[in-house]
């Protein structure tokens, strides 16, 4: 009887020790709106909306042969300094990986309108940040 209890105890201990740990729940992506020249801190990293290098998106109220593209530069600092060039058009790079974070440009506001020029200071980059 003692041997049977000892055997059951050993089997229970072995089963518990072999059980896999439940994987950590993934962190949901964080969406932020970053004004031109503004910065945000995320996990020890600083993300700054540094520049709009081009904006050839098709203006609202017009017909274009393609949707166009806007390109922005993010200055990334934390563990080293890097510049990320992100685009609104999916044919070009929209995401950048930096220090275990994936940064994606989802939208650039405002959208161009026919006959109007956008002041660089009115741009807002909509980004998702995911670890």
PLM feature segments, named:
Residues 19-21:
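Bacterial signal peptide processing site
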Residues 89-107:
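Short Fe-S-cluster ligation motifs
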Residues 15-17:
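C-terminal motif of bacterial Sec signal peptides marking the signal peptidase cleavage site
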Residues 42-62, 101-114:
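Charged, amphipathic alpha-helical segments
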Residues 110-120, 126-128:
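Short, exposed beta-strand-loop hairpins at the edges of beta-sheets
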Residues 26-43:
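Post-signal peptide N-terminal segment of mature Sec-exported envelope proteins
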Residues 47, 51-89:
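Mature extracytoplasmic domains of secretory-pathway proteins
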Residues 5-13:
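Sec-dependent N-terminal signal peptides
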């Amino acid at each position: 009887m003692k041997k049977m209890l000892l055997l059951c105890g050993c089997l229970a201990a072995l089963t518990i020790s072999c059980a896999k740990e439940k994987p950590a729940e993934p962190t949901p992506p964080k969406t932020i709106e970053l004004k031109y020249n503004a910065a945000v801190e995320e996990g020890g990293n600083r993300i700054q909306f540094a520049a709009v290098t081009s904006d050839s998106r098709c203006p609202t109220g017009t017909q274009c042969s393609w949707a166009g593209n806007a390109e922005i530069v993010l200055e990334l600092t934390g563990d080293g300094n890097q510049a990320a060039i992100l685009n609104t058009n999916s044919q070009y790079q929209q995401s950048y990986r930096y220090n275990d974070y994936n940064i994606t440009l989802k939208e650039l506001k405002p959208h161009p309108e026919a006959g109007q020029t956008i002041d660089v200071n009115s741009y807002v980059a909509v980004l998702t940040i995911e670890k």
